[in-house]
């Protein structure tokens, strides 16, 4: 024992004196055991025994560490020196208090920290780039300070430099104070001087700080004492920002060109929508110009433009979509009457003018010319009384003093005697196949040449109104029907009344259109020149070729009321086929079980009046008819400004239109063909059908 004057106590006397401190010494081997002889090197704790990393210090060991020892006395005044970058072999400092070394739940690496060691700034700011453990971390090494030579140790000294893990490490380096040390070739490079500008510590790590994603790497710092104020002050903190992450520009590979699910609106569609909006807006509509007045005003003549080309199959369809695009009117304002009647005491002008605006008609029937709403104020009893009067005005009989010729009277009496059997009983006709085929032919002609929309039709020889529904499908605005048989005209008017929402106005007159002008029977508002878009004559025009006067009157009535560009359509027997009589046939008769034709003479002088008797089962009962000389007919039409645009026999029309988009499906809808594609006509009916042909003329 020796007396220590500084501590004022006896301390054990050392047997071996401490060797002089060297400026350069090699680090001790990692697992050196202390000398058993109690030498001074063993007392200096240069080579502490290996410790179990997760084991905490006991209370006895903590008390022993605070005992006065010569090593503590000799090491208190040791000057600061640069330490190696290697992890310290004594992870637990002797002066570390017990509570900070044994904190519950802390990691084993936190127990090995020293107050004089700081974490690398890169280890605090960077996250783990991959899920596996990094070399040197507590999870990837058996020892908390395990080291893998394949990875370089990051240091605060090198945090501001560009590091390379593949660069070979130096075996020795020199510190700022000249002290040298030696380390393995795979260890970290030598630290820069403490006062170098390349390193400024971020903060001093304490055991309570949480560890980062990387394993803690400690850099030994000089031991500071309270007596040295210069070492208690740290360099001011300088924020250190990591390098910005690499930005990859968004440039995906497109599989297709960019597009939109929205349907674009084209300029023509916009113009169409604006036109519809303008027509439906009452504030933008101008008052209709006065067309006719019973006060004596003259109606302005329309100025239609001639047709530039013939209508094609793609221009329109015979069955366009049907909808009510006109405003509906109360039932009390719907009239089936013919000529308008003015209210007594009412002014002759104003709403009594006629014809009305055909483009704004009611879907139920005729407009009677009275102010809207007036009939709605009448009592129901008055309306019932007026209904009878309106029904009486539907048909106008022959003009007073008009006398029919004997042959015309025979024809009129024949058709008047034909009963109206209706659609149901018509199916039992022995020539139902031929009738349906003739209706299909008329539908083709109407579909090809009808004026759309809101056309005006003059039907000469309307019969019982069998074509009313066909013209309804063409969406016409006005229909005027005339026939020589007054009973047939009455039946046509009755059929029109039974139509649900016909969509057009209809007027019917009993009149001989081949002997007298139409102005004798038509009301003033319906006999305006160039008023009609279509004039039709179906299976009746051949009656006009009794003489030249009737033929010319027929052409005059057509040409006068047909506008420029309007179409005149019709069906007539083919005179060339009828004149193909056998030379040895003395009876001048031919036909089959369906029809028969008998001439009175084989050769006839002139082009008019060549008559024959025609019989058709369940249709025509031996009435006189006349051949139509085609060349003469075309010549008469040309004199009146009508140009031939269409001429085909019935079998040619069938061959041409049976596969068309518009008229091919009509063969099945109208019953010409059944579901198996079989025709309802037999050979005799087909022979009778081929006796006729269809035509169309355009007014120039």
Swiss-Prot record:
List of residues binding S-adenosyl-L-methionine: 442, 461, 483, 512, 538, 543
Biased composition (Low complexity): 129-144, 220-241
EC number: 2.1.1.56
Site (mRNA cap binding): 464, 470, 495, 542, 625, 692
Major enzyme class: transferase
Basic and acidic residues composition-biased segments: 1-10, 52-67
Recorded catalytic activity of this chain's protein: a 5'-end (5'-triphosphoguanosine)-ribonucleoside in mRNA + S-adenosyl-L-methionine = a 5'-end (N(7)-methyl 5'-triphosphoguanosine)-ribonucleoside in mRNA + S-adenosyl-L-homocysteine
Superkingdom, natural source: Eukaryota
Claim: Ion transport is one of the keywords in the record: no
Subcellular location: Nucleus
Gene Ontology, cellular component aspect: nucleus
Pfam family, one: mRNA_G-N7_MeTrfase
GO molecular function, one term: mRNA 5'-cap (guanine-N7-)-methyltransferase activity
SUPFAM superfamilies xref list: S-adenosyl-L-methionine-dependent methyltransferases
Segments forming domain mRNA cap 0 methyltransferase: 429-700
Biological function: Responsible for methylating the 5'-cap structure of mRNAs.
Protein name: mRNA cap guanine-N(7) methyltransferase
Organism: Cryptococcus neoformans var. neoformans serotype D (strain B-3501A)
Lineage: Eukaryota, Fungi, Dikarya, Basidiomycota, Agaricomycotina
């Amino acid at each position: 024992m020796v007396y220590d004057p500084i501590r004022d106590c006896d301390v054990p006397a050392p047997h071996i004196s401490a060797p002089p401190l060297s400026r350069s010494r090699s680090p001790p081997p990692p697992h050196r055991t202390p000398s058993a002889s109690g030498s001074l090197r063993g007392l200096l704790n240069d080579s502490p025994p290996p410790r179990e990393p997760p084991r905490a210090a006991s209370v006895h060991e903590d008390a022993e560490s605070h005992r006065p020892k010569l090593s503590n006395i000799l090491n208190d005044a040791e000057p600061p020196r640069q330490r190696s970058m290697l992890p310290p072999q004594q992870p637990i400092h002797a002066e570390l208090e017990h509570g900070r070394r044994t904190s519950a739940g802390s990691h084993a690496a936190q127990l090995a920290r020293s107050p004089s060691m700081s974490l690398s700034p890169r280890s605090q700011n960077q996250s783990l780039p991959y899920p596996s453990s990094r070399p040197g971390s507590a999870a990837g090494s058996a020892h908390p300070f395990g080291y893998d030579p394949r990875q370089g140790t990051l240091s605060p000294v090198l945090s501001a430099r560009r590091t390379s893990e593949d660069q070979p490490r130096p075996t020795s380096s020199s510190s700022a104070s000249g002290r040298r040390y030696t380390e393995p070739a795979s260890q970290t490079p030598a630290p820069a001087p403490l006062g170098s500008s390349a390193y400024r510590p971020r903060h001093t790590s304490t055991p309570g700080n949480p560890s980062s994603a990387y394993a803690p790497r400690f850099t030994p710092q000089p031991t500071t004492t309270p007596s040295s104020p210069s070492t208690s002050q740290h360099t001011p903190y300088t924020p250190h920002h990591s390098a910005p992450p690499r930005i990859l520009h968004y440039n995906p590979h497109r599989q297709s060109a960019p597009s939109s699910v929205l349907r674009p609106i084209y300029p023509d569609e916009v113009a169409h929508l604006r036109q519809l909006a303008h027509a439906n807006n009452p504030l933008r509509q101008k008052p209709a110009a006065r067309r006719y007045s019973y006060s004596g005003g003259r109606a302005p003549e329309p100025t239609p433009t001639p047709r530039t080309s013939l209508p094609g199959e793609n221009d329109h369809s015979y069955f366009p979509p049907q909808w009510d695009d006109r405003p509906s009117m109360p039932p009390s304002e719907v009239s089936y009457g013919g000529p308008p009647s003015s209210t007594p005491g009412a002014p002759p002008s104003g709403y009594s003018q006629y014809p009305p605006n055909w483009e704004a008609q009611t879907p139920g029937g005729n407009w009677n010319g009275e102010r809207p709403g007036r009939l709605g104020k009448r009592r129901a009893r008055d309306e019932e009384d007026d209904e009878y009067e309106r029904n009486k005005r539907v048909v106008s009989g022959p003009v007073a003093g008009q006398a029919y010729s004997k042959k015309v009277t025979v024809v009129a009496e024949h058709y008047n005697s034909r009963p109206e059997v209706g659609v149901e009983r018509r199916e039992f006709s022995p020539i139902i196949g031929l009738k349906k085929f003739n209706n299909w032919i008329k539908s083709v002609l109407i579909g090809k040449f009808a004026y759309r929309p809101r056309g005006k039709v003059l039907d000469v020889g309307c019969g019982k109104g069998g074509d009313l529904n066909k013209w309804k499908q063409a969406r016409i605005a006005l229909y005027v029907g005339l026939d020589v048989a007054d009973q047939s005209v009455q039946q046509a008017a009755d059929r029109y009344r039974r139509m649900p929402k016909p969509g057009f106005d209809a007027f019917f007159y009993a009149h001989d259109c081949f002997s007298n002008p139409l102005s004798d029977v038509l009301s003033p508002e319906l006999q305006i020149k160039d008023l009609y878009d279509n004039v039709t004559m179906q299976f009746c025009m051949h009656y006009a070729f009794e003489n030249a006067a009737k033929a010319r009157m027929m052409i005059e009535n057509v040409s006068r009321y047909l506008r420029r560009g309007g179409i005149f359509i019709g069906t007539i027997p083919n005179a060339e086929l009828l004149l193909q009589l056998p030379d040895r046939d003395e009876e001048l008769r031919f036909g089959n079980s369906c029809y028969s034709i008998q001439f009175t003479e084989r050769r006839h002088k002139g082009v008019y009046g060549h008559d024959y008797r025609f019989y058709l089962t369940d249709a025509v009962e031996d009435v006189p008819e006349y051949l139509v000389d085609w060349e003469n007919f075309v010549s008469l039409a040309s004199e009146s400004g009508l140009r031939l645009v269409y001429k085909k026999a019935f079998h040619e029309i069938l061959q041409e239109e049976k596969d068309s988009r518009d008229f091919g499906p009509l063969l099945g809808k109208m019953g010409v063909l059944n579901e198996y594609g079989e025709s309802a006509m037999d050979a005799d009916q087909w022979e009778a059908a081929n006796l006729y042909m269809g035509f169309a003329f355009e007014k120039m």
